[in-house]
Amino acid sequence: MSNLFVRKATGLVRSWSVFDAFIYAFFSINIVTLGFYSFSQMYFFGGGMINALVVSAIFLIFEIIVYSSLIAVMPRSGGDYVWMTRIFGGGTGFILAITGWWFTLWLWTPIYGDMLRQFVITPLLGVLGQQDLALWFSGKGTPLFVSTLIALAFVSIVIALGMKTYARVQKYSFYAGMLGLLILIIMLFTGSQAAFKSGFDNNASALFGAQSGAYDATVQAGTDAGATTPISGGALNLVFLTLPWLVFFNLWPNWGATLYGEVRGATDYKRNFAGMAWALGAVTVLGIIFFLGVAKTIGWDFYMQANGAWWNYAWGYVTDKPPLPVWPYPALLTVFLTGNRLIQIVVILLMSFWWFGWAGTLFLSSTRVIFAAAFDRLLPEKVAELNKNGTPINAMLLMVLPAIVVSYLYAYNVGAAPDGTGGFYTATLAATQGIAIMYFGTAIAAIVLPYVKKDLFNASPIAQMKVAGIPLITISGLIFGGFLAFLLVEWMFDPWLNTGGEGAGLYGISFKNTNSIIFLLVCYILSAAIYYGFKAYRKRGGIDMDKIQTEIPVE
């Protein structure tokens, strides 16, 4: 086997504990960054948020079963890439995994940069009295590009320092962030709507220069934007319509699956399942508590109206800035309950650790997929090299350098019409779609694994896990795959809304958004070109790629 791969063993070390993997899963479905960000955009739905949160979690349990099972069978760095290439064969697995984990993640870079400024830079500058700079960072174009470059620098450094260092960073961030969230929840459940209204008007003016009466003006702006999403209730079909947007936040408890070649005890299915399931359960409960706290003190209707007012402007539907001229970050809104600047600074600082503990998820998982492909000789051997910290540094550069270009195109919306419509921004709406398509491929691989790789399955720790004689991994793959199929159909066609084929529907990534579709197709074509190009190149050198992708590499 040693002459098949780049070297005899990958050289990656199992330096993470199961608890480290739990924290990574917990941060991957981050209630603050991904959660608060996604919730704020979901102001125009008819299904209740609590209902949608619970329903999505039920389906995602089957995702966790699928990934925990595959990890136990093949606990190798590269995750989806390794599983699909070994179960399907090289071409399909490579194209789906490389598009999902490599090219699509470039599109997430400016989103991480946007969250850095909205969750950390702008609110901190505001409570520190730097009003002009805070307002500058909340603007479009250059402020977004600058914050994205800062985010990229942090992510690159923390990943380059290796898995042990990253584990410490995320662990300390976990404790600090949880303390901040606990303070936030206490403030929400002990405050009153009357105190919040007064505090909002005072702080919005003092910190960000809002006009007097900002609270009432926000109510009007949000109402005009169509803010209607309820905290709970709604017909079942309306709840299901909410899910394709909500999963931008919680579809990722498996995000660390590509790293399990570096996790101790990864062949233990129960430990794998527990780590991801506890993360999903904890985040779901925290989400419900957050919603209830918001409803008590901020007021649910006002929260949605503030969100609608901001995104109606940010998405270009109106040109006038909202009464609160910065994103309505829930932590910022909560500290408006007090005029004590020290308390505001401490809470915002503690809450910022939700971003710092999570930021590495941007590229950390992806580097292992690129590394695994290079180890299989489907990319240059240099990409499989490790630095002294055990990081595939060249694989990371293949994420970072293109991400800078993508972030520039996104921040300045290159190619947009004079009225601001279209442009590169619309192409990035496929950021979730491309990953979900890859997950669908992995779900299919899980379904067929017991039948096409019988010896491997029968020798695995999950061989006896069956329901009515059917492998649990197959049943779970069918359910999770069905859920993904629903999401993909909704994103592509919006069938319950666009009965006449009009508009882009609720999600903005239907077939009507040609930029997004073209971008995805180009990514798949590029992946196919890399695969078949390297396969032909290796064949000329006497290397059988089909043989390589029947073997499982040694870590």
Question: Which residue stretches match the model-derived regions?
Answer:
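Membrane-interface "cap" regions at the ends of multi-pass membrane proteins
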Residues: 1-48, 60-65, 200-218, 531-555
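TM-loop-TM module centered on a large, flexible mid-protein loop between adjacent transmembrane helices
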Residues: 82-89, 219, 277-359, 379-427
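Loop-to-transmembrane helix boundary motifs in multi-pass membrane proteins
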Residues: 18-19, 142-149, 263-285, 356, ...
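Hydrophobic, membrane-embedded alpha-helices of multi-pass small-molecule transporters
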Residues: 16, 20-34, 148-154, 208-297, ...
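Hydrophobic transmembrane alpha-helices that form the core helical bundles
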Residues: 41, 61-152, 362-366, 485
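C-terminal membrane-solvent junction of multi-pass transporters and transport-like membrane proteins
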Residues: 12, 142-143, 155, 172, ...
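Membrane-interface loop-to-helix entry segments
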Residues: 16, 145-211, 251, 273-282, ...
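A generic transmembrane alpha-helix motif of multi-pass inner-membrane proteins
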Residues: 51, 184-186, 190-194, 425-438, ...
